[in-house]
From Swiss-Prot:
Remarks, miscellaneous: B.subtilis SleB could not be detected with anti-B.cereus SleB antiserum and vice versa.
Originating organism: Bacillus subtilis (strain 168)
Entries under InterPro entries matching the protein: Cell_wall_hydrolase_SleB (IPR011105), Peptidoglycan-bd-like (IPR002477), PGBD-like_sf (IPR036365), PGBDSf (IPR036366), SleB_dom1 (IPR042047), Spore_cortex_SleB (IPR014224)
Pfam families: Hydrolase_2, PG_binding_1
Organism domain of life: Bacteria
Region of interest called Disordered, as start-end residue ranges on this chain: 130-185
Function (record text): Could be a lytic transglycosylase. Required for spore cortex hydrolysis during germination. Interacts strongly but noncovalently with spore components.
Amino acid composition bias (Basic and acidic residues), ranges on this chain: 142-156
Bias (Low complexity) ranges: 158-172
Protein name stated in the entry: Spore cortex-lytic enzyme
Length: 305
């Protein structure tokens, strides 16, 4: 009995030691400091990278704890039910971050040392998260612009379904009601159309009207593709799919132009020429998106297969 008791005591002590070691290792991924707004250094780099891994932080990983990092921390704390939602990164927040994310330190530090533009999102291979060289960017842009100049007869004609714009003598309210009645296709609800308009407004306001229709068309093309979710909301809110969702602009009030662009896309106008992807060449950092076969450029966006 004494021997068995000794063995049990040793097992308990061993378990306690292992648990303590694991918890210590978990915390030690960061230093012991409480990270807060205004902080700089490696702790902040890791913080930003881990937050970006799960999509909470979409800014530059630069080791400077500014307002963007602050709100990302608060959103993370709130999402995971932490007691303190205050932007202060103490032991509990660090533990939760380590549990819910990954940090590829060597990759991040290499990119910072080289001065590269890069990201650290989860579920995307790291080799696709470093912005290509200026030479590669310029070459791809020139190719897209060259293709844009080629005749594309199938997209130059706008469908006649939008001919109601010439009815200037009809009251605006009546025209709006007529457009909804005439253009609302089966299978799309008012909520679908509003959500599409919010996405178009968040992604492409200020772009040429053709470019706004093209954004709506890309969403519809994804809806019809087996590679993407089978609902409007599913496509739009798919993780990392749209910048407007990541930065909250999806919730802005869309204007009538965005709504009209959605209706034109639903009625068959596809200036994107069946594109499934698009990106802004001035801000895109992913070699993966740059490597997609490019169809054309409209305004600030390049549309891809």
């Amino acid at each position: 009995m004494k021997s068995k008791g000794s063995i049990m005591a040793c097992l308990i002590l061993f378990s306690f030691t292992i648990t303590t070691f694991i918890n210590t290792e978990t915390i030690s991924a960061f230093s012991n400091q409480v990270i807060q707004r205004g902080a700089t250094g490696d702790d902040v780099v890791e913080l930003q990278a881990r937050l970006q891994y799960n999509g909470y932080y979409n800014g530059k990983i630069d080791g400077v704890y500014g307002w963007g990092t602050y709100w990302a921390v608060r959103n993370f704390q709130d999402q995971f039910g932490l007691k303190e939602v205050d932007g202060l990164v103490g032991a509990k927040t660090k533990q939760t971050l380590i549990c819910k994310s990954k940090y590829y330190r060597e990759y991040v530090m290499e990119q910072l040392n080289k001065g590269n533009t890069f990201t650290h999102y989860g579920k995307i291979p790291l080799k696709y998260q470093t912005k290509p060289s200026k030479a590669a960017t310029q070459k791809a842009r020139q190719q897209a612009e060259a293709r844009q100049k080629q005749p594309a007869e199938k997209t130059t004609q706008k469908p006649k379904a939008n001919a109601n714009k010439q009815q200037n003598n009809t009251p605006a309210k009546a025209r709006k009601q007529d457009a909804v009645a005439a253009n609302m296709p089966g299978g799309f609800s008012n909520n679908d159309i509003r959500l599409l308009a919010q996405a178009v407004y968040g992604e492409a306001r200020g772009e040429p009207y053709e470019g706004q229709v093209a954004i709506a068309a890309v969403i519809l093309n994804r809806l019809n593709s087996p590679l993407f979710p089978n609902s409007v909301a599913g496509v739009i809110f798919e993780p990392l799919a749209f910048t407007a969702v990541a930065d909250g602009q999806i919730y802005m009030q869309p204007n009538e132009t965005a709504r009209e662009a959605v209706l034109d896309a639903i009625n068959g106008w596809d200036p994107s020429e069946e594109a499934l992807y698009y990106f802004n060449p001035d801000t895109a950092t992913s070699p993966w998106i740059w490597g997609r076969p490019q169809i054309k450029r409209i305004g600030k966006h390049i549309f891809c297969e």
